[in-house]
Amino acid sequence: RTHCNQELLEGSRVKFIATATIGFDHIDTEYCKRAGIEWTNAPGCNSASVAQYIQSSLLIWKSLRNKKLDELTIGIVGVGNVGSKVAKVAEDFGIRVLLNDLPREEKEGKESFTSLNKIAEECDIITFHVPLYKEGKYKTFHLADEDFFNSLKRKPVIINTSRGEVIDTGTLLKALNNGSISDAIIDVWEHEPEINRELLEKVIIGTPHIAGYSADGKANATRMSLDAICKFFHI
């Protein structure tokens, strides 16, 4: 992805950025705000594709590890466009579902949500579907850090299709090596486009950030970006 930051944009005539992606961590939003540059992303454009990836991965994992999904509990961290669809997939499999989403919990109340600590203690499957925020109230950078892995009780399988930096790679490797987790399913990697070869060799499923790649996802993202451009320029 092109990094849309001060180095690229300063002195240019750019007034609007449309990214055909869910994530926008490649856009320096603070600089854009200072420079008067508006931007938009495409939330939910490929959510069905990512949910299908999770569905397929769970079926593969179930088969390889001889698991009965309807006896397990899944923790979904981030319950937006993707996470909500993953919850439906899990429910259809008969899996007990726990949801963690701090921004939604603060808006909607605690009734439907639980803490990350409870997910760490009770879940056999933990899957991450949060945007990458490197700082601030809802920081997700290294959300799964050493403290998180040390709090795990059930040796879960860890799934990440959000952003590589949401999980501390070094700590993830340590957890795989010492048995704190049973498996990992990884589609996103720290420091992309590089892929950590040691981690790749240890995960049960490893893919190069393709969970959301589908014809429908690309078409949706393109349409959403085009609509945003037309709206901005009053076309």
Task: Give a label for each model feature.
Residues 43, 51, 70-91:
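Glycine-rich adenosine-cofactor-binding loop
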Residues 11-15, 35-38, 95, 154-156, ...:
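A short helix->loop->beta-strand "cap" motif at the edges of active sites that frequently abuts
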Residues 33, 40-49, 192-235:
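C-terminal helix-to-coil terminal segments
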Residues 92-109:
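NAD(P)-binding Rossmann-fold cofactor-contacting core
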Residues 105-197:
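Rossmann-like adenosine-cofactor binding region
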Residues 1-65:
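Phosphate/diphosphate ligand-binding glycine-rich loop within oxidoreductases
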Residues 51-67, 92-95, 223-231:
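Oxidoreductase and adenylate-handling cofactor-binding alpha/beta cores
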